[in-house]
Amino acid sequence: MKIGLLRPCPLVALWALALCLSTVSCEAQRADRAYLRGDYAKAARELQYLAEQGDAKAQFDLGLLYDTGRGVPQSNEEALKWYQMAADHGEPRAQYNLGLMYANGQGVQQDNAQAYFWVSLSAEQGNGHAMDARDFLYEKMTPEQVARAKEFVREYEKARKLDTSCQLCPLLKGKSAP
């Protein structure tokens, strides 16, 4: 009989998983409610935990709080850090905001090629603002920046093993305009 107590119980495992998932969901809901009430400090505290657990939406939201100085001291460096994490997880709004930070030299050295790269990733996911920003940046880029942007895309595609036939970056395909 003692051996039976040591066997895993599927119902207990499912209950534990549901509890774990509902805890994360509850924290996200608490963060959203706090933000909507204007309690940005509480939202930041709730988001911090989720962001550290790898939640891309929470990373973006926390980056936005640092970017705007709501509930936390305004910090370009912290905003950049959280946007970068979320962008690396594929969050299109973070990719767009990260691109803007590179375009404007906000918390990072101004770099049109990096800016173009990040807004292109966001545009590929349907972000209309990113599409406009990508087109605007393209007009400002030098041939050297175009070459660097192509290299960023190649490296990214190699690292992520993306299909190079996608519309990720028109520059990679040698098109003259986005």
List each model region and its residues.
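N-terminal leader/linker segments that initiate helical-solenoid repeat arrays
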Residues: L21-E46, P178
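N-terminal secretory signal peptides that target proteins for export/translocation
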Residues: M1-P8
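Short helix-capping/linker turns of helical repeat alpha-solenoids
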Residues: A34-D39, Q48, E52-D55, T68-R70, ...
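Bacterial N-terminal signal peptides
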Residues: P10-S22
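Terminal, low-structured helical/coil segments at or just beyond the last alpha-helical repeat
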Residues: A130-P178
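Hydrophobic face of amphipathic alpha-helices that form TPR/SEL1-like repeat modules
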Residues: Q29-A34, Y49-L50, D61-T68, N97-N104, ...
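Alpha-solenoid helical repeat scaffolds
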Residues: F60-D61, R93-L100, N112, F117, ...
